[in-house]
């Protein structure tokens, strides 16, 4: 999969996330995906774990991610992401922040994602 296809996949996945289409998100991930649970300080390692994490998160808040730029990092892809969390009425719970999501791929699917506060760490 080339960089253009990877960018398209991440953009589509971000839209699915913002629309709470969990099964569409899981469809672009390998079965043993590694996904960060930032609040819990752990790494989730399966579709079932990621699904449960997102469904619990969506019950309490409405996180929104907007990828604004992409940088190839070897075989990985780093997305510059504007992120903000809202309540279900649309009131912001957090200020918008910029974070960096680094995606690793296996074949045409996401194998892992990590979150970084700064660009240099994401590209390292």
Sequence positions of predicted segments:
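A beta-strand edge to alpha-helix "cap/lid" segment located at domain peripheries
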Residues: 1-5, 51-124
